[in-house]
């Protein structure tokens, strides 16, 4: 369990994270995986080479190598390490004490969460876009790591923690600006947390939370919320329609680092199936759509994706000669 301390000192705010020295941030939250299989690498290379309009959908598993935990990974995910569960949308909207607790914890966790950097998997996908291989990238993550890596053909399905909005008037604010307002309102407040959650949340006691002051919207005085989809909320229908159109334009779909347990992402796999698109999945552990995939790889995203050359062509290989034909489930009408 890692410990995180946030306290004011000599006019500055200090954040300190302690973790076991034997575990670097890139491996702390990554579940065990088998060694890379050269044959699987070749199969993924062929899949990518034959793709002309590739759509990629990423989940929390792509960011664990950047030091951000996921929810469901065996032994290392939030659900495996603790009985804590993410905040529910209805609780946040209805309860001022719930918002106070959320923002106090988020305030402590923000310096660490916002400092995370893209790993080789994020950079690889950004490079695929630059070289014209990637038609569109859809991420279920809220960490902004794809944007930091330079991806532009990007939809952040569940929003982004780096933005804050007012629940009354919809005014948007940069999260870093809100951090300064938190500091101004809580000049002598300090806290020590145990454990970090996938969305930058940390774990504080009720006593620590009680004295924390939360700012309101500068424009209308309304309550503030991170611009993300909390559990129990729904994705904006216009955004869903937009992604459905991108899937229908694509000729193949690659899932990276997602178990697809959440319907907001899984629905696009169903659309791809309806379109009879070949589907490949790169994820450590089983997913909800393994039976729909023509290729499944249990490897670290940051180890495998950089090995794929998006410029390589297989003009001598016909789609019907692929070693991993579409599964019968994917061919069903």
Swiss-Prot record:
CDD domains: SIRT4
GO biological process: cellular response to hypoxia; DNA damage response; glutamine metabolic process; negative regulation of cardiac muscle cell apoptotic process; negative regulation of fatty acid oxidation; negative regulation of insulin secretion; negative regulation of protein processing involved in protein targeting to mitochondrion; peptidyl-lysine deacetylation
Induction note: Expression is directly activated by ATF4/CREB2. In response to mTORC1 signal, expression is down-regulated due to degradation of ATF4/CREB2. Induced following DNA damage. The expression is strongly inhibited by fasting.
Transit peptide (residue range): 1-25
One term under GO cellular component: mitochondrial matrix
Keywords: DNA damage, Glycosyltransferase, Metal-binding, Mitochondrion, NAD, Nucleotidyltransferase, Transferase, Transit peptide, Tumor suppressor, Zinc
Residue span, Deacetylase sirtuin-type domain: 34-323
Tissues where the protein occurs: Detected in kidney, heart, brain, liver and pancreatic islets (at protein level).
EC nos: 2.3.1.-, 2.4.2.-, 2.3.1.286
Null allele phenotype: No visible phenotype. Decreased mitochondrial protein ADP-ribosylation. Increased plasma insulin levels. Mice develop lung tumors more frequently. Defects in lipid metabolism, leading to increased protection against diet-induced obesity. Animals show higher levels of NAD(+) in liver. In the hepatic periportal zone, decreased number of mitochondria with an increase in their length.
Cofactor(s) listed: Zn(2+)
Record: residues binding Zn(2+): 166, 169, 217, 220
Locations listed in the record: Mitochondrion matrix
Binding site for NAD(+): 59-79, 140-143, 257-259, 283-285, 301
Keyword Protein transport among record annotations: no
Uppermost EC category: transferase
Reactions mediated catalytically: N(6)-[(R)-lipoyl]-L-lysyl-[protein] + NAD(+) + H2O = 2''-O-lipoyl-ADP-D-ribose + nicotinamide + L-lysyl-[protein]; N(6)-biotinyl-L-lysyl-[protein] + NAD(+) + H2O = 2''-O-biotinyl-ADP-D-ribose + nicotinamide + L-lysyl-[protein]; N(6)-acetyl-L-lysyl-[protein] + NAD(+) + H2O = 2''-O-acetyl-ADP-D-ribose + nicotinamide + L-lysyl-[protein]; L-cysteinyl-[protein] + NAD(+) = S-(ADP-D-ribosyl)-L-cysteinyl-[protein] + nicotinamide + H(+)
NCBIfam families: PRK05333.1
PANTHER family: NAD-DEPENDENT PROTEIN DEACYLASE SIRTUIN-5, MITOCHONDRIAL-RELATED
Entry function: Acts as a NAD-dependent protein lipoamidase, biotinylase, deacetylase and ADP-ribosyl transferase. Catalyzes more efficiently removal of lipoyl- and biotinyl- than acetyl-lysine modifications. Inhibits the pyruvate dehydrogenase complex (PDH) activity via the enzymatic hydrolysis of the lipoamide cofactor from the E2 component, DLAT, in a phosphorylation-independent manner. Catalyzes the transfer of ADP-ribosyl groups onto target proteins, including mitochondrial GLUD1, inhibiting GLUD1 enzyme activity.
Similarity section: Belongs to the sirtuin family. Class II subfamily.
Subunit structure, interactors included: Interacts with IDE and SLC25A5. Interacts with GLUD1. Interacts with DLAT and PDHX. Interacts with MCCC1 (via the biotin carboxylation domain). Interacts with PCCA and PC.
Note: According to some authors, ADP-ribosyltransferase activity of sirtuins may be an inefficient side reaction of the deacetylase activity and may not be physiologically relevant.
Name listed for the protein in its UniProt record: NAD-dependent protein lipoamidase sirtuin-4, mitochondrial
Organism: Mus musculus
């Amino acid at each position: 369990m890692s410990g995180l301390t946030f306290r004011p000192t000599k006019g500055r705010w200090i954040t300190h994270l302690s973790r076991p020295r034997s575990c670097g941030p890139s491996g702390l939250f990554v579940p065990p995986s088998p060694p890379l299989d050269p044959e699987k690498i070749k199969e993924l290379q062929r899949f990518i080479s034959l793709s002309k309009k590739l759509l990629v959908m990423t989940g929390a598993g792509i960011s664990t190598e950047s030091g951000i935990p996921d929810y469901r990974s065996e032994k290392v995910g939030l659900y495996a390490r603790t009985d804590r569960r993410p905040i529910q949308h209805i609780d946040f909207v209805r309860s001022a004490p719930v918002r106070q607790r959320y923002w106090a914890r988020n305030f402590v966790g923000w310096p660490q969460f916002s400092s995370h950097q893209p790993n080789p998997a994020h950079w690889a996908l950004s490079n695929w876009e630059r070289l014209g291989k990637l038609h569109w990238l859809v991420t279920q993550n809220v960490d902004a790591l794809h944007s930091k890596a330079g991806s532009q053909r990007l939809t952040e399905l569940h929003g982004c923690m780096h933005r804050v909005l007012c629940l009354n008037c919809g005014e948007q604010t940069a999260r870093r600006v809100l951090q300064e307002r938190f500091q101004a309102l809580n000049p002598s407040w300090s806290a020590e947390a145990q454990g970090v959650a996938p969305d930058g949340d940390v774990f504080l006691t009720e006593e620590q939370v009680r004295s924390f002051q939360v700012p309101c919207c500068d424009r209308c005085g309304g309550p503030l919320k991170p611009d993300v989809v909390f559990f129990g909320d729904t994705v904006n229908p216009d955004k869903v329609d937009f992604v459905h159109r991108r899937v229908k334009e694509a000729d193949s779909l690659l899932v990276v680092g997602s178990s697809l347990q959440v319907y907001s992402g899984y629905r696009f796999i169903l659309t791809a199936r309806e379109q009879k698109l070949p589907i490949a999945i790169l994820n450590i552990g089983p997913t909800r759509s393994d039976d729909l995939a023509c290729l499944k790889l249990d490897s670290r995203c940051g180890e495998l994706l950089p090995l794929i050359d998006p410029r390589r062509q297989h003009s001598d290989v016909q789609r019907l000669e692929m070693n991993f034909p579409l599964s019968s489930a994917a061919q069903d009408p």
